[in-house]
Every structure is written in C-alpha cells, then in structure tokens.
Amino acid sequence: MMGIFEYNQDELLGTVESVDTSTAIIKVENDDKLRGLQVNHLVTIQSSKVGQHLIGLVSKIIRKSGFTDSAEDLTPDLSFNVIKVVLIGTHLDKEGLKENVFRRSLATVPTINAECYLINGERLKQFMQAVSSVPEGQEQICLQIGNYSIDEDATAWINGNKLFQRHAVIVGSTGSGKSWCVAKILEQVAELKSADALLFDIHGEYSTLEGDNFTHLKVAGPNDTISEGILFLPYWLLTYEEMLSLMLDRSDNNAPNQAMMFSNQVIKHKKDFLHGMGLEEMEANITLDSPIPYSLDKMIDCLTALDQEMVPRARAGAEKKGPYNGQLTRFIQRLETKRKDKRLNFMFSREESLLKYDYMDELCCKLMLPAQNGKKGVKIIDFSEVPSDILPLIVSLIARVVFSVQQWSQVGERHPIAIFCDEAHLYIPAYTEKSIDDASLVTFERISKEGRKYGVGLVVISQRPSEVNRTVLSQSNNFIAMRLTN
C-alpha cells in the first residue's frame, strides 16, 4: 500500500531543531521554500513509528535576521530560518482494515532531525478526506462545506454521521458566512435518503432554500387559517409549567390558589374530552402534561363560576362568598387577554379541527416524517410572526414534542432527527429573566443531555455564543467556528 505521505528528498521542507510536548521548531535551509510558506499551512513530520506521520499547523515563520523573541524561547541570534509548528494529530497509513486514518492525538513526539514536509496539492485533498473519514470514491455521502483557504483545490469535508451523532455548534459573527454554511449543509442533507431534519428559522431568512426535498412550514400569523404549510400549536400541547409561565402572574397574592384551580380544571376537562370520545379507559393514565385536547372556553366558564361563587351561610336564606370568590379574577382576565390576542392566533384559534383527538398525530407527521414514500426530509419552520416575548416558549414546544415522541417510540421504530436551532441565543439563553425562558431552557438542556439516547441531535447556530446556555454548549462535541466577536 502506498501512503499519501510518500515524499521525494527534493520535497524536504526542513528538519526538527527543537521540540516540546505540543510544538516543534523546524529548521528551513531553503529560502525559496520559506517564502512559499504561510501561517496555517499544514505539514507532516516524520514519526519514530513506521506508518505514522505527525501532523502540524504552521503558527509562526521566522527568517534568519537576528530576530529576538524571548517569550517563545527561540535563540536570540538566529543563524537559520525557522518555523514554529503546533502539533495537532497523527496520520496512520493503516489502522486495522482502515487506510489513511487521522487521529486527534499524539502517539509520539518528533525526534531531533526528523524530516518535515509540506502538505499541499493532491496530498492535501487526500488528507482532508482522511480528517473527515471520507472513504475514497464515496465523497457524495459526506458534506462539503467549502475549500481549504490556502489551497482552493482541496475540498473541506464533514462526515455527516459523526456531525449528527453528537450535538454540533455552528458559530460566527454576522457576515462571516454562518447562514451560508448552514444552507450548504442542509442542501446536501436534503439529497440523502431517509434524511430527517428540522430548521428553526427565526427570521424567515431560509425561505429561499428550494427543492424537491424541502418542506416550508410557517407558524400561523394573525390572519392565517388552517391550510397546508401553516402550523397551529394549540394551547393544550403546553405542559402545566409552560401554561403557567404564559398565564400566571407569580407576584399575585392569589397565585398559589390560581395555579391549583387551573390544574384541577385542566385535568377535569381533559377527562371530559376523553369521556366524550368514548375513551374512558384512558382517564386513569393521563396527567396534567398529557397532550389531550380540551375546551378553553368551557374551562374559563368554570373558573368564572368559581370566582363568582356564593355559598349558603349557616343561617337559612343567607349567602357568603365561596372559597375562591374574587381570587381568580386577574387570572381569568389574563386568560381572556391571551385568548383575544390576534398575534397568538396559532395557539388560541377557535378552529374546531384543532380540538380533534388525532391532531397530535397530524402535527407529528408534518414535523417528523423522514424522506421516505414521497415525504420531504428537511422541514424549515418560519417563526417570523411569533411575538418575541413568547418565542422561547413556542420554539421549545416544538422541540419538546419531537423529543417526547422519540422517547415514547419503540427503539426499532425511532428514526434519528436533527434539530437546527438558528439564532439559538434568543431561546437558549445563558441567563434567564422570565419564567418563559426557564421553561425553554428546561427542554433544550434535557435534549442536550439525553437527546442522543433517543436519536435527537441538536445543531446550535448563533452569532453570539457567549449568550448561549453553557450546559447546552458543553454537551456538544462538534464545532464549526468562523470569525467571532461575541
């Protein structure tokens, strides 16, 4: 077998002059070769083990001119050209049955006088394939994100399996090409068999992504009605805590009673719905968080009755205020206000079809079916008409539904799905100020910790990584980092 790092002697760049645990200083005698070098060029250094090559990144180039850099421990009076190389890994000609394997670790460090060669041209192309574990001749199964800046003929690949098996992060300042990178990845993912991905498009900037394998969905706006491509997320999909974060004013002195009565009414009306559907056998197993439809109008009527209730006194014919009389007034007002808010049409629409027992199935089919049987694998969800004050709640609602369905599914029936979280700092914040933000964080932190067990991968996308939750970032293994200022 011929390795990719077989060089002729006239290709020699230099030899190792000094070495420590992570860097090596290379002596370069040929001035022409020194002039052809650039910072960030890749080099290979001869290893003491047969079939292994140490890979390094050029971090500094110094010409013989008496330049002094005591901080770098270089000889004050240089009589030869040197380059400083940061060691980044080891290339193996063969490992088991695999050929051209790159490992991000050092089995050895260079020895003095070890030969150093530049990685360029065809060797750079082959090495980039090795880095992303692309089998030669099978480039179409991997994801291309661009070309190596120092040699534009060398393609930069990402191994799709490795990218999505672990949570990923794509960061870069505005204008650095972050959105282009995301779009490029999605265009290639969409072409793959059985692809399944969701993109949370917060500002509608990915509407131009078109093709037979893309589905564009939009969270309903104020004037939207039930139709293909329009998403309605009815209130009964919210968990108890999510509903309280939206409706309850925790500074109210009556907040504990309001929360208790709300929970009682939710359970009651969910059971009433099941009873009306002839599904009494399910009543014993439902919880506050079970996605069972119920009528908000009927629940408000019941709460209003409790708020105005008068009960008999001990003296015949006399009445007094009931135990909850006047305590639910502000809570009911908040419910009514949300109910009438046109901006929340996607949640509080009075469309009767949103109270169907099988609406959850229809929603999950829109969100989660992979690219099979004519279905489109990449779903782009436009949140541009969702009010910013409840955006974290609505985005996390969809993420939670996806995670919960994956969790409930039998192992053999699960299909892996990737969730691309664009503008993640808006709904996965490092610091929270509102209970709505807390509810969102609970969902995404759980997915970051447990999602891989159930086939749910996160791709966190942000131009402000310092404002993204640290727990979510710490659970990510793959990083694509562009120019950053935040």
Identify the residue ranges that each predicted region occupies.
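Basic- and hydrophobic-enriched, low-structure N-terminal and domain-boundary segments
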Residues: M1-V171, I185, G412-H415, Y427-Y431
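Glycine-rich phosphate-binding loop of nucleotide-binding enzymes
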Residues: Q140-P222, R470
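Substrate-engagement module of ASCE P-loop NTPases
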Residues: Q188-E191, V402-Q407, S440-L458
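Loop/turn-to-beta-strand initiation segments
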Residues: S194-L198, K375-V378, R414-A418, Y454-V459
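P-loop NTPase motor domains
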Residues: S207-T208, F214-L217, Y235-T443
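Conserved AAA+ ATPase "SRH/arginine-finger" region at the nucleotide-binding site
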Residues: K218-G221, F232-L237, S476-N486
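Conserved ATP-driven motor cores of ASCE-family P-loop NTPases powering translocation/secretion/packaging/pilus
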Residues: D249, E445-E450, Y454-N486
